Amino acid sequence: MADYTPMMQQYLQIKEEQQDAILFFRLGDFYEMFFEDARIASRELEIVLTARDGGAGSKIPMCGVPYHSVDNYLARLINRGYKVAICEQVEDPREAKGIVKREVTRIVTPGTIIEEQLLDQAKNNFLAAVEEEPLCTGIAYIDISTGEFWLSEIAGENARSRVESEILRISPAECLLAGSGSLTGSWEEEWLRQQNITLTVWDELPLSLERAESLLLRQLQVASLESFGLKSYSAGIKAAARIIAFLEETQKTSLQHIKSLRCYSSDNFLEMDFYSRRNLELTATLREGKREGSLLSILDESRTAMGKRLLRRWIEQPLREAGEIEERLDAVDELKNTLSLRTELTPLLSRINDLERLGGKIGASVASPRDLLGLKSSLAVINDIKKALQPCRSEILQRLAAMDALEEVFALIDASINDEAPLGIKEGELIKTGYKQEIDELRELSQEGSNWLVEFENREKQRTGIKNLKVGFNKVFGYYIEITKSNLSLAPADYHRKQTLVNSERFISDELKQYEEKILGSRERLYSLEYQEFIKIREALIPYLPRVMETAHAIAILDVLQGLAEVAYQNNYIRPEIDNSGKIRIRAGRHPVVEKALREARFVPNDLQLDRDKARFAIITGPNMGGKSTFMRQAALLVLMAQMGSFIPAEEARIGLVDKIFTRVGASDDLAAGQSTFMVEMIEVANILNNASDNSLVILDEIGRGTSTYDGLSIAQAVSEYLLENSRSKVLFATHYHQLTRLAEKLPGIINLSVSVKETGNTVVFLKKVLPGKADKSYGLHVARLAGLPEKLIIRAEDILQGLEKNKDSRPAPTLLQPLLFSDSHPVVDELKQLHIDDLSPREALQLLYQWQKMLDDK
């Protein structure tokens, strides 16, 4: 190292501590990268790789990016999975004795982004941590840009799959795992990476419970965790503390806006596994992963960034407690039926900036003057919102009418920060005139200097006779006099040449140099004083941050409720009745997304009645394109919407509270994991069988079609009987196995439904209407004709079909239904009675299905 230049030695010393990150090393107006970092950055950022003299004749690979556009380059590296260490100059180069002092001021990872340009305003950017203990698993997650900090624990039956589902619901940008955790190194690690979640194995400090509690108490600035209801959450506390320790290591500063930690239980929310969330297209479409076409895109009429993020959370975490749901419905009801209130609130909400992330920037000490002005302009409308809410009667709206307007914060910013303040904080013009006398005096002196420069320029024009003479300034030479080459002969003898340009020469004079020292001295003092005063003002806002965050949350709730009311009004939604009856009764229900996509065409509404104690299992038959999948997804979405507190598209609805929604729809190979369509299907079915309860809603679409006909039919029937025997879940099961419709004659609780078709000659019209009874045929050839298959092929297929139908009676009929699979005398029943279902993995459940199928075939 001794052969390197002093600056390069400094770089290598700092890089030694940042081996796993690309080091952005500040040199003047650029961030430079060297050695392997430079090669990586050059390739990933598509910037030129050059070389620099490192000492002793060595050439070191180098590339760089301008500091003022660093966010763009930072985003590209983070999105590609790199960590970036930001190394800044921490002293004024003019005051440095030798090499300018530099330090890593922050390490940027996917879960620690605070730059506004790198964040999606409608989505949280969570950093999560998982801590496993023998009896439970703790999950914590934080969005440092908003200050939201959550903690939970999962234990009991099927805890592992519930942990995975919860992580995927949170959808963190980054997940911290302890190196000793059982998640690490298992297939889940690669699986989570496929969900674009960066996994960071980080166990630099072994966390005892005592150490974890100490970290949290220091961050939250409280004497006991009991005030947050956390005392018994040992695994959750360790997960939360791991996050805080990681942030202390990477952010190099105290995050003053993180003063609250909220715990929750997944038992309070309607549960959906990863497959169900994906299949129902709650926040993104299944095929393209786009927001447009999802339920979120239909329900989002929010006007604020906080509201958009909260709406996403409500969709992903519907409630299970009737009282909370009714509170939300009361508020939506009142807003929907009070047009004048919505008309008044909408423009007011539109004027509110992202208070959560503004508070986060203040807490992280990165807020600019314009951020403070954004906070002020948002607070300016709070009292108008409170006034509009005063007449409201619903409980939530009454609470929101009492939100904190933070008058002290508004007054401080209004009195101190210049309304036209620049984006930066070191160029002056930050502080209002009249706020601080010393700043006013320096500003006046600086202004006098500017006036003197104008006067000096005019005087020199007269003295020299050079009409286009001008006085300018740059950081290298300071103030100068510029004369075009055509007028050089008129330059006075007391001008001293400093710089030659293509078309002009630049000079200085003794008088200008003397006044420059006075002007620049006062201006530097002014800028320095304004900077110091701004920092004081920003720090003075920190004690108010908990109140800012509370007001931000209140605005978010109001915004979501207002948006749901607007959607209900515009789309003719009705208020569902919520109870614990175990029944789902929907009259003229409509699919919220499909009906909007139809535009001109009219969506065909359908009724649905399921009863946990009576007809709880509907087998749905009929042709493809008939509307079976839409009908089933519609049922799940309407239940979900009702339990999140939204009105729903129907004429009437009674929703008995559901604890879990499961969906198995569509076919998709998981090639990356080496799993076929059928394997994926069976894993999803096993998950449903292991986890469905008496209060669950199960959606099954074409179970068993990924294998041979008899294999598929036997599995489909076995699944149906298992659900009937082992739970009272409400089930919608669409199938092409018409043999299954006979189950309704033999098993109580099963009903048949079918999608109606109008047939005229060789043409069919799919009426999209779901009616009682079974379908008499599948209309597969009609669908093939509609799809545009050659007519010659269709005619040949019809001939083959007729031949098969003539011969079907000559073949022995399948014995699947005689006797029923789960009749008391069958050996499978004996195995089931001895089986501990909760201990089965999906793979073990699948193996059992194959084993039972073989027993059936042998018999």
Curated annotation (Swiss-Prot):
GO cellular component terms attached to this protein's record: cytosol
Alphabetized UniProt keyword annotations: ATP-binding, DNA damage, DNA repair, DNA-binding, Nucleotide-binding
Keyword flag Aminoacyl-tRNA synthetase: no
Protein origin, superkingdom: Bacteria
SMART domains: MUTSac, MUTSd
Database matches in InterPro entries: DNA_mismatch_repair_MutS, DNA_mismatch_repair_MutS-lik_N, DNA_mismatch_repair_MutS/MSH, DNA_mismatch_repair_MutS_C, DNA_mismatch_repair_MutS_clamp, DNA_mismatch_repair_MutS_core, DNA_mismatch_repair_MutS_N, DNA_mismatch_repair_MutS_sf
Amino acids binding ATP: G622, P623, N624, M625, G626, G627, K628, S629
Example of a GO biological process term: mismatch repair
A GO MF label: ATP binding
SUPFAM superfamilies, per the entry: DNA repair protein MutS, domain I, DNA repair protein MutS, domain II, DNA repair protein MutS, domain III, P-loop containing nucleoside triphosphate hydrolases
Known function: This protein is involved in the repair of mismatches in DNA. It is possible that it carries out the mismatch recognition step. This protein has a weak ATPase activity.
Family from the record: Belongs to the DNA mismatch repair MutS family.
Name of the protein in question: DNA mismatch repair protein MutS
Organism: Syntrophomonas wolfei subsp. wolfei (strain DSM 2245B / Goettingen)
Gene: mutS
